[in-house]
Amino acid sequence: RDSPMTEQADLMLKGGRIIDPESGLDEIQDIAFKDGKVSALADSLATMPAKQIHDVSGKIISPGLIDLHTHVYWGGTALGVEAESLTSRSGTTTFVDAGSAGAGNYAGFQRFIADPSKLRILGFMNISFAGICGFSKTTPNIFPECEDIRLLDARECVDAIREFPQSVVGIKVRIGRYASGNAGMTPLQIAREVAEETGLPLMTHVDFPPPDRDEVLNFMRPGDIWT
């Protein structure tokens, strides 16, 4: 399947393994790009001129990857990293932040991280009003954000989710000895209430009992995420 096309491409990648989950393609082929879009795809593009040609044999070419569990609220939590600094090394173009921000600070995440980024940045909103706030760069779990039930206001979380429909894709809760102390299943129950009202999935981080992991799994719904 040689390509008869001769229009000059901006970039050609030769001999890479092209994987496209949407079309089911998984083959070693040449691929060319023009004006930022795929212009040709064939077993060989030897007759097509290109401004840049790179042999990528042994490498994978794919659409941008999605990382479902990241913390990219740089400056908003000690866990936060700059998404732009990772994308060229990882091939990731969609970063899903796993609960760095809650109802009290998601607006900052949206305005200063998601909106200005050239990448696609989405978020799970933390059921805790303050998000993941109890970390420093040297000491984890200074403050378990889900231990104080006063921070777990379901109505505040629902209202904030509805304020940012362009980026919120779910609800995040962290439970266990270090994340929620003696609060038991209560943080998870509140988070599930929000998930059911908003029709969004729930992502649950579990550290050490209590609560028991089987109890947590049995409470989660199909389509929810364990992390």
Region annotations inferred by a language model:
Residues 173-227:
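Active-site core of metal-dependent hydrolases
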Residues 112-116, 158-166, 216-221:
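Acidic (Asp/Glu)-rich catalytic clusters
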Residues 76-85, 150-161, 210-216:
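Short, acidic/polar
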Residues 64-70, 95-97, 121-125, 169-173, ...:
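Hydrophobic faces of well-ordered beta-strands that scaffold small-molecule active sites
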Residues 47-48, 55-116:
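Metal-associated gating/positioning segment near the N- to mid-region
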Residues 5-12, 17-62:
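Histidine-rich, glycine-flanked metal-binding segment
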Residues 90-96, 100-101, 116-149, 172-179:
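Metal-cofactor-binding active-site regions of metalloenzymes
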Residues 139-187, 193, 227:
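Active-site gating/metal-coordination segments in enzymes
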